[in-house]
Structures are given as structure tokens and as C-alpha cells.
Amino acid sequence: MAASVEPRQPFGRLDAPATAPTARAPGSNGIRRRADSPVRGCGFPSLISPPRKGPVAEEEEDDDDEDDEGHEDWREAYGSHLQLEVEPSTRDPRDEGTADAWIERNPSLIRLTGKHPLNCEPPLARLMHHGFITPAPLHYVRNHGAVPRGDWATWTVEVTGLVRRPARLTMDELANGFPAAEVPATLVCAGNRRKEQNMVQQTVGFNWGAAGVSTSVWRGARLRDVLLRCGVMSKKGQALNVCFEGAEDLPGGGGSKYGTSVSREWAMDPSRDIILPYAQNGEPLLPDHGYPVRVLIPGCIGGRMVKWVRRIVVTTAESDNYYHFKDNRVLPSHVDAELANAEAWWYRPEYIINELNTNCVITTPGHDEILPINAFTTQRAYTIKGYAYSGGGKKITRVEVTLDGGESWMLCTLDIPEKPNKYGRYWCWCFWSVEIEVLDLLGAKEVAVRTWDQTHNTQPEKLIWNLMGMMNNCWFKIKVNVCRPHKGEIGLVFEHPTQPGNQTGGWMARQKHLETAEAAAPGLKRSTSTPFMNTAGDKQFTMSEVRKHGSKESAWIVVHGHVYDCTAFLKDHPGGADSILINAGSDCTEEFDAIHSDKAKALLDTYRIGELITTGTGYNSDNSVHGGSSLSHLAPIREATKVAGAPIALSSPREKVPCRLVDKKELSHDVRLFRFALPSSDQVLGLPVGKHIFVCATIDGKLCMRAYTPTSMVDEIGQFELLVKVYFRDEHPKFPNGGLMTQYLESLQVGSSYIDVKGPLGHVEYTGRGNFVINGKQRRARRLAMICGGSGITPMYQVIQAVLRDQPEDETEMHLVYANRSEDDILLRDELDRWAAEYPDRLKVWYVIDQVKRPEDGWKFSVGFVTEDILRAHVPEGGDDTLALACGPPPMIKFAISPNLEKMKYDMANSFISF
């Protein structure tokens, strides 16, 4: 079997128009299945026509079995083929003003080196969501500078040096003049998991997390065929190395291209499947991945695979390029930057990295994932999952997990979708899983994993630091801590070692902060930051101190380097205590700015108690979507009503969940019903009745967050719906720019656009049959007075839906007064009217509108404002068994609802809830 397959049937040609694209178009939804694809579970369209049969060049080596591959039925060999799920690409505002502003990129990629150049990795959960093949827009990126603008029609690759027939090959010649090889290969940056090393001691490299790894099917001409066509000389002719040079202009060494080399022996070895790919996953290469052509050396580190390749030079000596020597080395642990330069350690050949080492990572549970411990979860095993890979074509043969620090090991189940090439080499990652009894996890402090390959190489237990932070492959360990995800219950929260880039979170980062704080505290006497007007807070706090205050008993936050104690404000916060508690103990600068007005920002100064100590380590910013790591003090997280066994998407209120837009319906000129798919089709959203979610998006370069209540059933599997009234630009004189988020949602493309959601949020939960939990306290009501305006109907709708689904057991009476501008603006009217007619003893509905647009229809409800008379006529009077729920514009609540309910004997402190 072969991982590099010569086509055996007529294929379509890759179109090379007169003006070839400089950027790849969005991925096609119509990917055809290929019977000869060398990977189970994926299929790609063919890109080229096979050339005429005949020798590629003057053969200098016997390879009689060169053409004996590819005869079997690939459908039978690899099973059913799957379509790739589309990942969107768009112009990223973060690229504005840079040389890469023309490139479309996936917005979910985590940037590791600021705006430019792009170095990024996908979110680990998103990477694993796609399984064996990584969509090209989600593939990790390592760029040293600006991306060259490639043009298929004019691009050439020069082959020169110790060859008898130097050539300058066009892209058409590469694509149509050589047999095509299709090679599935996992690419890994040598710095994968580097941040773990940086937590011990800073290296010279940036913070790669555990997702600097991706897998694609690459298609291109074999390097061996190209060199033979050009008459590569033999070793006797001193042809010992093959050098590659890219097109980008870089600063290294005073100015150079990116270049490196491999031995001639490697380049001519047919078993190594080295190719010059021009396609990835059945599409032309993306600009970030080397369009129009690059080098692929399977089983090797990414740093050897030159992108935008322009020159291939056969030489006697290895490459003398600056990046060949000053990058991709594993130096001994005692060698620091000064010693490496002084004693020329960079040039010692024994420290160069070529083949990947053995490595594996735990991906499930995710960082900050919470496993509730209850009667349901303890009756079934919990599945731990991850990926593993090795280099040099070696097969992964074993993965083991330990719960006791290596005293005993459990063998994992391997999932190896790839078949070896005909030389027995494996170029791709595999996946592993193991089922653990929940009670065993309850007694564990950490979970560690290690892997073995076919040469019985395995991973060291402890991290081995090196100057460049390369090839980190110690046991991957996650910590297991007890928390309280539900009032009266306990749960387990899992903590990964780090989070990528400058995101905080992770047990190694927490340990680093503690050590730094202890060392720095005696010497840090005064703050150097600019004080706010409130000068009372002169104290300084470390981030580790802030993290201790993550509960409703003590809720601290950090905004723009200042520390605030918001405990006293929890009960008065308009968005409810949960909105503060999900960020308590963390730096929430970005999220605070995204949803608060200048007035709110000024109000915040009242609660300032001091400033955050910065120690120069660069890890004090807490913009991670996961928040801090002291999760034993999390606010109560209630389990949603759900189908037994269905996993919850909103497993942590601190974590953003990417959701794809799968349907959009226009209910009126400005009302839309959006349907979003959850990351996994077997998940439920996990939103309790009465709670809401934050929808998060980056708009014009800034984070925007808005609260929404889904209108779909709380136990709907795989997706959820949002009913949204779109506020368009120039429609209302008070808001000439319209609604920022609603217009953004309106612009999303069905099938390819994503939003992030987080939650559950809110201080109210309806637990059924008249029972509520309000700010953590139980409250029972037999009658509900529901008053709302506009889109404020959605939380009411959610409660109504829950009550009516539980008939006849739920005897709660609901009296709804719903205000809008006109009869055309009433949302969900058909459903409300139908329910009111079907359940007259449970639901009564009364509408109030500002103006009647169609008097001929015979409007029978109120016109004008919500008044005391209207409320007295259509909602019950206050009492111990009555609860008022309100949701609408602040003026409506302040002037129309609150004072009139107070006149109707409502206890506004205990019997009135504003969503």
C-alpha cells in the first residue's frame, strides 16, 4: 500500500488561468470522492491529468517495483470517504496595515506573535473536531515574514547546481509534466508545546501550545522525479545535498531568503515521499501554506519544508542559509544564547533537527472542562482522548495513560486511519482513547500520557529544557481538581499545562505566577502605572492573589491593569451577578470593554482597590476565553435539562464555543431566525431555562458581545435558534449606525460563518413547576406576571415553553403583557396566540402597541404605553405566590413597569425580576 499514489485513471486538469489566483477561493462544498485516496475518511478531487508513460529521466538506481502500487480497490482498503467540513476564511482586521492585508484567514486561529508576521495555531478543540484531516484554513501557520504574492502563470522553480540539465520549471510543467504523488502527511512545528518550556525558563521562541500540528493530503511532483529529469549528479560527482530557497525577503543574517537543505540520499529516496506540492486537500495551496508550490518532507519538522519555493540547488555542502543554522536546533540544556553565539554551537551538526520525535497530547478533557459528579455521570465511564505522532515514518504502536504518576499504566485504544506506503512508512498522526471510571478520576490528582513508536522510543517523564524550546515531548499531564459545578454537588475540573500564545490559564502558568510573585513581592513597593481618579487603592496585587477571589463571597476583576472588588456590586449589577462571577478572579479587560458604556466604566472606579503587579514576564494578561485557573471557587453552574447522555456544549461559562450558522429565515423585513450548529451533532447547548448566552464576535477589530436567549427547546440536540430583530443603519434617528451585533449577524453567510457563544449567564433559573432559583436562592410562585417589550419576549418565551411542555403537572399561571411599536413588530405572535388558545388556564396574552398600522384589521388590544390600568387589567396583583418578570428597554422598566407594579403591592426587592 502506498501513501504516495500515482494516478491510475483519467483525472481532470488543474485550471491555470491567464491570471492565476493569488489567494485560494473558499473551499468547495462539492468535493468529489476518490477511490484511490490513500486515507480512510477523506476524499479529494483530482487535480491533474497523468502524463504519458515512459521514463522520467535517466535512472541511475534500480527501482523495478516503482510502479507496483495502487492496484487495489481503495474504497475497500480505506472504508467510506467523508466530506471535509468547510472552515471559513475572511479578511482579518488584525492584518490591516500589514503586508498581509490581502490574505483571507480563519478568524478562530490563535495568533502567537501579535499582528505580523502570522504565526498561529487552531484552538485545540476545533482541531480535534475535524478529526484526521485538518481543513487548510485551520492548519497551523509558521511565517517568518510577509507572505509573497504568488502567481501561477509566472511562477518558476529553478533547479540548478550539480545537475546536468539545469531547468526553470513553470507551474504548468510541474503540475502536468510529472506523475502526481498524493501524500497524506502530518506537519508539526518543532516548537509544538514550547510554552511548557517557557514556563520553566524563557527560551528564544514564542509560545506554541499543543496545536502546532495539522494533517493534510498534499499533491505534487516527486522531488526525485524532478531531480532525475534535470540529471542530478551522483555522490561520486560530489552531489551530497539538496538546498531549497523560498521567495520571501527576511531580515535574518542581514537580509536573506528562507532556506535549508536535506541530504541527496534523502531527496532521492523513493520511500520518503518527498514532493513539491501545489495542492492541499484537493485545492490549490493557500497563500500562508506556500502558494503556488512548496516542499513537503513527510516525517520531518516543518522548518525543513520551504514554502513559496523558488530555487532547488544541488550542492556538495549543506545549506549556508542563516535560517538553516540559526533555527531548528536542540542544544544541550546548559547552553544559553550567549554561550551558543560565543562558542558557535549553532554550527555543530549533531544538534540539527530533521525527523520528528515521538509525542502525544491529551485533547479530551479540554482545559477548564468540568465533569459533574452525580448519579448519572458515575454510572458510565469517562473517555479520555488525544493524538499521537512520531517521525521518520515510524508507526505509533502504543499509548498509555497513568493516574498515579507512572506507578501503573492503562493501555489505550488506537485509531490509525492511515495505511503505510509500500515501504512501510507512516506519515500521519493517529488518535487514541481510553475509558476511565469516574470514581477513579475522583481519586486522581493528575492524568499523564505517553506514547511509543515501532522502534520502542517513548517520551521522557520530565521536560528537558533547551534554548530554542524545540521538540518538547515530555509526558503530557493534566491536573484534576475538585470544584462545585452545581449547588450541593461536586465536580472535577481539568487543567492543561498551558494555553497557547499570551493566553493565561494552565497549571504550569499558575505555578509560574506563584513562583514569580513570591520572588518579586519583597522588591515591589510602588506602582508605576497611571492611577485612576480613585487614589484610595494604593495596594498592589499579583495575578495569583486576584485568582483567589473568584466567588460570590469575594469577586475581584482586573480591567486595564487595575484591580476591582465587585463583591458589593453583585446584587445591583444590571446584567446579574453571573456576568461578573464568570470573570471573577481574572483579567476581563477585553470583555468589559466589549459590553460596557463609558458611564459603566466610570462607575467601576468606585470599586477600585489597587493595581496589578507586572513582573515583566509577559504572562499577566488574562484575555484567555478560559479565564483563570482557580476554579474551585467558580460560581454555581447548573446543569441544564437535557436528554440523558447528551454532552453539553456550554460545559464552562468561561469558555467560548464556536457555532456555525446553518440556516437563516427572514420572518419580516427586520426579523431573522438564525439556526446555529453546535460543535458536535450529539451535543445539547446546556442552557437552563431563564439563563442567556453571550454571542461574541470581532467587529472592526474589537470584541463585541451581546446577550441573547435562544428560542429553541433547551434539550434540542446539535443546534439552537436565535430570534433576532435587526437594527439597520439609518432607520432610527437616535441610533443612526444601527445595531452593531445584529447587523453583523445579518451579514453572516449560511454554511461557512461562525460565532462564538459563552454561558450560561444570568441570575434567574426556572427549574420547573413554579420553582425558581434567583441569585442562588429558591423562590416559588404560582402566578407569573410577565411584562416585556420588543425582543425582550425571548426569555419569557423560554419560560412559557418550559411550563407548557410540562402539562398538566406544571400548574403555573402566566399573564403576559407584550409591548411593541406596531402590530408588525410583534415577535412570535403566532406561537403565543396558539398557546393562549390551547392553554387558556395557563397562559393569557395581551398586546400593547404604539400605533395601529392596519385599523381595518380590527385591532382589539391596547394602543399607547404600558400603564397602571393595563397592568391591573391583565396581570395579577402582588402577593406571596406571585412573581413579576420583566425584560425590555431600561426606560420602559424604570417608568412604566416598576412604579406601576409597586402600586399593585409587588415586593420589588423579592418578587420582581428584571432579565
Curated annotation (Swiss-Prot):
Reaction it catalyzes: nitrite + NAD(+) + H2O = nitrate + NADH + H(+)
GO terms under biological process: nitrate assimilation; nitric oxide biosynthetic process; sulfur compound metabolic process
PROSITE patterns recorded: CYTOCHROME_B5_1, CYTOCHROME_B5_2, FAD_FR, MOLYBDOPTERIN_EUK
Biased composition (Basic and acidic residues): 88-97
Domain FAD-binding FR-type span(s) in chain numbering: 654-767
Function according to Swiss-Prot or TrEMBL: Nitrate reductase is a key enzyme involved in the first step of nitrate assimilation in plants, fungi and bacteria.
Region Disordered, residue ranges: 1-102
Source taxonomy: Eukaryota, Viridiplantae, Streptophyta, Embryophyta, Tracheophyta
Residues at which FAD binds: 706-709, 723-728, 735, 740-742, 791, 794
SMART domains listed in its UniProt record: Cyt-b5
Sequence ranges of Low complexity compositional bias: 16-26
Compositionally biased tracts (Acidic residues): 57-71
Molecular function terms from GO: FAD binding; heme binding; molybdenum ion binding; molybdopterin cofactor binding; nitrate reductase (NADH) activity; nitrate reductase (NADPH) activity; sulfite oxidase activity
EC number: 1.7.1.1
Residues of the signal peptide: none
UniProt-listed Gene3D superfamilies: 2.60.40.650, Cytochrome b5-like heme/steroid binding domain (3.10.120.10), Nucleotide-binding domain of ferredoxin-NADP reductase (FNR) module (3.40.50.80), Oxidoreductase, molybdopterin-binding domain (3.90.420.10), Translation factors (2.40.30.10)
SUPFAM superfamilies, per database record: Cytochrome b5-like heme/steroid binding domain (SSF55856), E set domains (SSF81296), Ferredoxin reductase-like, C-terminal NADP-linked domain (SSF52343), Oxidoreductase molybdopterin-binding domain (SSF56524), Riboflavin synthase domain-like (SSF63380)
This protein's GO CC annotations: organelle membrane
Name assigned to this protein: Nitrate reductase [NADH]
Amino-acid positions noted as binding Mo-molybdopterin in the UniProt annotation, renumbered to this chain: C189
Residues annotated to bind heme: H573, H596
Cofactors: FAD; heme; Mo-molybdopterin
Residue span(s) of domain Cytochrome b5 heme-binding: 538-613
Keywords associated with the record: Disulfide bond, FAD, Flavoprotein, Heme, Iron, Metal-binding, Molybdenum, NAD, Nitrate assimilation, Oxidoreductase
Family to which this protein belongs: Belongs to the nitrate reductase family.
